[in-house]
From Swiss-Prot:
Protein name per the record: Cytochrome c-type biogenesis CcmH-like mitochondrial protein
Pfam families, A to Z: CcmH
Subcellular locations according to the entry: Mitochondrion inner membrane
Topology in the lipid bilayer: Single-pass membrane protein
Side of membrane Mitochondrial matrix, spans: 106-159
Length: 159
């Protein structure tokens, strides 16, 4: 009687392992379902292949490798993180960072140009330090208050 309990537990463990692997494999016919959830013929065959491989004593990694070799990387829900995947995920971040840096640089450059123009206007004019500060205060416009997305949206909607 004990052997049957042990055999039953072993069979349940193998079945749970097969289901776990099947949940991580995409049905090649359905596309959006795992082979565990799909009733397509190919999904049934893949589930049987996984159970046969487990019965042969292969590890999960070996089974995933075999499936990837036979059906391609798209059959797995968790593809490898390689150079192509990194480029796919990091490109939007790099573009957003570059755009933000460009905007900050343009605003800084514009502000710096106004300061230089104001200084060039009063160059050579005999002024006391107090008069110089007063004229620069008049010539250089104040920095605009920081504007958030909400205030810009309101201004755009009120046009």
């Amino acid at each position: 009687m004990e052997k049957t309990d042990e055999e039953r537990k072993k069979a349940q463990m193998l079945d749970a392992r097969a289901r776990n692997i099947s949940h991580n494999v995409r049905c090649t016919e359905c596309g959006s379902q795992s082979i565990e959830d799909s009733q397509a013929d190919i999904a049934i065959l893949l589930r049987q292949l996984i159970r046969n491989e487990i019965g042969a004593g292969k590890t999960d990694k070996e089974i995933y490798s075999k499936l990837e070799d036979e059906f391609g990387e798209t059959v797995l829900y968790a593809p490898k993180f390689d150079l192509q995947t990194a480029a796919l995920w990091l490109t939007p971040v790099i573009i957003a960072g570059g755009t933000a840096a460009g905007i900050v640089y343009q605003k800084h450059r514009l502000r710096k140009n106004v300061d230089i123009m104001a200084l060039n206007l009063i160059r050579g004019v005999p002024l006391t330090p107090k008069e110089r500060v007063t004229i620069l205060d008049v010539l250089i416009p104040p920095s605009p208050p920081p504007q958030g997305v909400v205030s810009r949206l309101r201004r755009w909607l009120n046009r």
